[in-house]
Each structure stands twice: as structure tokens, then as C-alpha cells.
């Protein structure tokens, strides 16, 4: 027997070196060995759900929580109906909801999946901003460490306050991270013990002490990233506030809504675990509250059924195969030329659409430029084998590397 827990989790996808999905490898191994495999999840991946719908997989459901605890209620807080004060991200309604729970001795979690203090730093006098010298991305300001950090290559820099125009820089910190939300929470609840729960704070030696304090309700308010959704049991946590649901539901990733569904169901599962009434609040500026209502509904099948219809209509995975081809190199012009030549080479020889080439959303990563091609075709080994044979024959320019990602999960 093979058991794959949290089968939907993106961490099963190895996206460096040899690229593969460990869940799919486990399914293949079970098939080769003719042994059963159990895929366990609160919200299945869209591929698994489609296999359930067409009867390829059988399904067993647990329709009750442990000890018959009720599922948390979900409420949407529409920020279009309120005016936030300058440089704040929590509405008065949100603060009032949190205060109601704190009065009942409930723990409160403010959730924002963004590390650090601010994702973008700009001087409003000289207009200089801090970007990573190795990647085409902003450096994130970590206030506690007084450090600017690239979350992709690890580059670190200090905040230079000397202005190229005159005197000292007058910084604008654009957008919040968990450190900034923590400061705002402390201003609103000065007498409460507040703790940040992220990979920056929980990988230290004292993390077990922090966990014990949370369990014993010595920490009343948590400000956390996605790390907090990973299977922790906090008996007093009965209020979760998602600071910005728009951050995860929008963007260039076709799986953004699916990933949000999985994340927020996992996150909601942290609340109300001991039977007390619990609520998850979602702050949003989006006027399309239908999609948010589906994502936050306790029945994930509502969203998954609609998502499958959209994917089928538009011939998107799991109804077609995507194969991502990422070309990387230090010479931008040579890379662009190779990408166009390679596309022409492929188009003449395979029975599939080749989209691109386009610059990757993160165009430069670890000092190398990145260009993407995307192959859309039938789900067949014949297509994969023919692409593999063509790649083996093709001669790229010196310094150009090709990475092949079958069934990509991320499109960065």
C-alpha cells in the first residue's frame, strides 16, 4: 500500500534538477507493482477530481470533523464599502470582529502569505528602488533584520539611506508583509501578545517554545504566512482573518484559483478544532464575490465542478497536456534568437501548438535570462516521446540551457 498525504500539495513537484511530481511517480509505481494507492486530501487537485468524476478513482469521504466539531463559518469583508486610513490594511469592521473573539478568550490569526515588512521600497525624492542585481524582482525589506532580501536567490543588502538627489532618502514602503501587519495589529491591540508565524521566525531553536505558548493561549494573536496552514493544532484558534484574498486569487497562473481553494480550506481547518464556533473572514477589493464565495465555501466540489467545466471548454489541463520549455542563458540576444529558431524547429515536426516564445514572468533569475515556450497537445506518450527525440537532435548555442517541465504547476 502507498499513501500520499495532502496529494494536492505543490511541494510534491520537484522543479529543479530532474523535474517530476512525486505524487504522479507514486501513482505510476503503484500501477507497475499492481498495489493499491490512497491519495489523501481535504481538497483534491483538479487532476485527481477529474479522475474521480470519470470513475477512474474511487472515493471515500469524511463528512464530519474530529469529535464532530463544526466547520468554521466564512464571511467576506468588502473593502470597497469602507475607507482605510493611509498605510493601513485592516478595516474597522475587521478590527471589531477580531476584538469580539478576543473578548471571548479566542485566539486570532491574521493571515498574509508574504514574508518580511514590505515587498517594494522606493525613495520619493530620487525615485530609486531596490531591485535584486541577480533577478528581475524587487528586494523585500525585512525590518527586524534591517535587511533587503531576494526570496529567489538569497541576495542580501542593507538599506542605503544616502539619497542621490540630496541628504537622506525619504522611503516609501509599498505594500505589506507579515511584519508590517504585525505592527498594525499591535497598534490596535496594544495589550495583547502578538507573534509572527513564518519561515523567518519558526526555523529557530526556540520554535518549539513558541508552539507551546500558542497551544497554551499565552500568545493571543498570530500573524502568519502559509506555513501556519500546515497541519498544526491550535485548540484556542477560533478566528482567522485573511488580510488580502486578492493577493492569491489573481495573476498569470491558470491554477491560481485552484491553489487558493486548497490553501484556504487547509487554513480554515486550523480554526474551531475543539468544537467552539469559529469564523474565517476574507478581506477583498474584488467585485467578483462569486468566485470568492466558491473558494471559501465549505464544500469544495462547487468550485471544482465549475472549474472543470471552464478547463474543458478552453482545452486546459487536465483535458490537454501542457509542456513548458524554459530556455535560460546569460546572453539575452542569443537566448531570444535560439528561442525563435527552436520554436520553428518544433512547429514543423510535432502535432501540437507551440506558444511563445515569451519572457518568463521572472525574466532574470540567478543572473540568467529566461524565455518560455508552451506546448499544448493531447495527453499521449507519443507527443512526449517525439518532443524528447527532437530535443536530443537539436543543437543549442553555447551557454543556453533547456529545462522541460511536463504538467507545470508554476508559471514563474
Where is each model-derived feature located?
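A structural preference for short, hydrophobic beta-strand core positions in alpha/beta folds
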Residues: 39, 194-197, 354-357, 404-406
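Nucleotide-binding motor/catalytic cores of P-loop/tubulin-like NTPases across gene-expression machines
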Residues: 351, 366-369
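Short proline/glycine- and acidic-rich turn/helix-capping motifs at secondary-structure junctions
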Residues: 356-366, 402-412
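Short, charged interaction patches at domain edges and termini
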Residues: 374-386, 409-411
